[in-house]
């Protein structure tokens, strides 16, 4: 950066006003001595292509994709990191001279954080949701050695799609109309609804 021109990064989401990533990223940039700004952008699904073109045109270093763009963004990428390709969803895009590479840090971050409390290896898990974040969590947990993963989702097709994906590392269990009553070691919420709760749920684990 020279003079008053900072490098730009940001996030595309709906709703952007509820996304606290801007505070975290700008604090990290300042701590590292980087002259980079992070901008939250309100981007509805029908304007995602415009937002991507704008970021490339303005020379952004990259951007994050939050709800509801983590799967739709795949249509605009030139390449994906291997784990992101397996997950089929991206939350981080790197721009190198107009060449966009997608990465998914949701599942990796989840597993790293989880391991400070409980190792997912050999555990029975329930994942709520089947969207971008839930896909990342389920895939990375399967790769980390979870014994079983039960997907609970509102729509059958999307839930079965995710179950079939993680079946590569385990045994597929047939669809059930109700949530399983079998005791699980760990429940994780990968849905959008948890962002709107007035107070957090206290979910424990059993070992």
Model-derived features with residue positions:
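Residue-level detector of alpha-helical secondary structure
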Residues: 176, 180, 184-187, 198
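Glycine-rich adenosine-cofactor-binding loop
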Residues: 13, 114, 123-142
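NAD(P)-binding Rossmann-fold cofactor-contacting core
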Residues: 146-166
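Charged, low-complexity interaction regions
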Residues: 188-194
């Amino acid at each position: 950066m020279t003079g008053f021109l900072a490098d730009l990064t940001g996030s595309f989401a709906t709703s952007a006003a509820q996304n606290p990533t801007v505070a975290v990223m700008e604090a990290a940039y300042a701590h590292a001595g980087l002259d980079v700004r992070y901008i939250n952008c309100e981007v509805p699904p029908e304007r995602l292509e415009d937002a991507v073109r704008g970021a490339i045109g303005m020379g952004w270093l990259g951007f994050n994709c939050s709800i509801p763009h983590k799967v739709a963004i795949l249509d605009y990428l030139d390449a994906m990191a291997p784990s992101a390709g397996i997950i089929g969803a991206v939350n981080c895009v790197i721009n190198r001279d107009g060449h966009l590479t997608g990465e998914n840090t949701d599942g990796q971050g989840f597993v790293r954080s989880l391991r400070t409390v409980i190792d997912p290896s050999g555990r029975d898990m329930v994942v709520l949701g089947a969207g971008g974040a839930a896909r990342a969590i389920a895939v990375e947990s399967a790769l980390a050695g979870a014994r079983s993963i039960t997907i609970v989702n509102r729509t059958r097709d999307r839930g079965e799609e995710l179950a079939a994906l993680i079946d590569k590392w385990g045994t597929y269990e047939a669809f059930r109309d109700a949530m399983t009553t079998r005791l699980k070691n760990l429940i994780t919420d990968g849905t959008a609804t948890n962002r709107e709760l007035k107070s957090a749920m206290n979910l424990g684990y059993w070992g």
